[in-house]
Every structure is written in C-alpha cells, then in structure tokens.
Amino acid sequence: MRFGVGMYSAQRPPGSPFTHRELYDDMLRQARLAEDVSLDSFWIAEHHFAGDGYAAAVIPVCAAVLGATHRLIAGTSVAIASFYNPLRLAEDAIALDLLSGGRFVLGLGTAYRPEEFAGMGIEPETDEARLDEVVDILERAFTGEPFSYRGRFYGIPQVTVTPPPFTDGGPPIMLAGDGVADRDALRAGARGKRYMVDPSLPLDEVTRLVALYDRAYKGREQLDLPLFNYGFVSDDADPWAEMREGFTYLRQTYDRWGGRPVRDVRRENHRLVLGDRQAVVREVLAYHHQFGDRLHFILRVNYPGQDPSRSDRAVELWGDVASMVRREIGRSA
C-alpha cells in the first residue's frame, strides 16, 4: 500500500494574504516534508485562465518537485490531454522520467470549462476523442521505436521520440474519471492504465466504478489503485473547522465552473477522511480492507486560503498515519 498527498492547486482566493510566489514555495516545502515523513507521492492539479491563479503549468511544477526530492513520486492529477501537443508531451514526460529515475506519473483527463476550451482553441465535443488519440501517441512514443500515426485530430509522419525513457514502456499513465463515469472507468481498464476516480463521489459509487474498471482491466498485471480523497488530520483542533473555509471555496468554485447551482457545503454531504491520527488510521484501514494492498491512498490536506503552517502540520500527521497503517497491515499479514 502507498500513501500520497495532493492535489495541490496553488489557488489564491480573494483576500488571501499569501502571494503566488509564496504558494509555490509552500508546494515545494511540503513536497520535501512529504518525503521526510515517508509519504510516497505528491500530486498537482491543472486548470487554466482561473481568476485565482489555479495551477496551470503542471509539467514544470512536477519537475521542480522531483528536483527537490529524492524518493517521492510526483504526478499530474490531471493534465488536460487535449491542451497539449502529444509529441512534445511525450518528450517532456520522458525527460522527467529520466531526470527522476522513474518517479513521474502522467495523469491525463478531460476539461469542462468553456473558458479553457475557448482559450485553447479546442471544440468541447472533441475532448474525449483527443484524449484517446493522445494516449495512442504516447504509447507509441514511449517505445523508442519509429512510428507514424493518423487519427482524426493528430497526424504524425514517421518519427522516433528520443531519448528512450528510463522506465520500461515509459512513465506510467493514469486516466481520470471526470467525464461520463462508466465510460471513464472502462477506458482506463481497457487501455491497461491506472484509474483516478473523481474524489467527490460517494464511496458506494467509487466501489462500483472500481469494479467496472477491474472487469475491463482483467488479465493484466495488477497496478496500484490511486484513490484521491478530501480530508484533514489534526490532533489539536477540529479537523473540519480547519478545512471548512478552503474546502467550501474549492467546491463552490467547481460548481461555478461546471455551470451548476452553487451549493452549501456540509460535512455530511461529502466523502471526507478527517479526524485525529487514530481516527484517520481506522478510516484508512477500512479502505485497505475493501481495496487491498494495491491501494494508493492520496489525501488532500491543503486548501485555498489556508495558513500553510496548518497544512504543514497536517502533512506531518498524515505521514504518522501512514506509518501506523503500515505497521498495522504488517501485523495482520
């Protein structure tokens, strides 16, 4: 079982006292801290043209995280595939794979904001098909062999993407479930990729989608299951109070971007993993009981506008939780 932290979005809500320079410094500091407390991975999200400066350049941010650490995995959660030149994306991913010795995961997904499609010059109805073609091209590019490609959106004459990657078959690709949920799960499974379930979904829906993914994936070597979760760990304050303001801002921002009515954010309406260390250990063990050793449990403990000293402490406590869960799993093995 693995443990990660994220997603980091570097948002600056109205009235925030923290500059974007400070927010990016905070990301790198927390990446080093995550490694120090023996967490396994660190994840960065992507959006574009957001008034709060939501992180847009995930590839260079991952490069900075990988350069600041020695063991930590860094991944995109997710890069919007249709906004990238697929050959250049392949070259960038291979460079990160080489520089880090295999510690980069390329998470890919689709978009939904009209402003992003308009700004990038992409027709929304082509987004999912473009994702499929980008993955086709990446798979070929990562072989280090000559290939050509003729798709609906991308045409590539015979090329060889060099140098070849450090990781056999190229850096791992994770596909996100942000579109039509069943189709997303089936795509990831049929293509033999890791699957990222939308962290806002309730557990029964997560369980159903993972089962759907497993059926489509059947017959291949088992991959880890990256399960992203919202929550917080605190031993000296109410964890919901610690995350409520920033989480509310985040969820209501997503409502606005998705063209939905802006909803009240109540603790009981969300799948949250929060509490003191012992409470979070119990919750994580329940997830492990359900999904097994392949579980890669990723917890978001940083929220827009939050005092970074509080999320620093939450990362430390999350590292404690990870160590406690590992010991408990070891005892019961």
Residue ranges of model-derived segments:
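Hydrophobic faces of well-ordered beta-strands that scaffold small-molecule active sites
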Residues: F3-M7, F42-I44, A74-T76, F104-L108, ...
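Internal, glycine-rich beta/alpha segment that forms the wall or movable "lid"
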Residues: S82, R88-R191, D204-A211
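N-terminal small/glycine-rich loop or linker at the start of catalytic domains
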Residues: M1-F18, R113, G155-P171, G258-E268, ...
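Active-site mouth loops of central-metabolism enzymes
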Residues: Q11-Y24, A79-L87, G169-V180, N269-R277
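An alpha-helical appendage that flanks or caps ligand/catalytic pockets
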Residues: M7, D36, E125-V161, D204-H296, ...
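N-terminal beta1-alpha1-beta2 module of alpha/beta enzyme domains
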Residues: M1-A68, I73, G169-P171
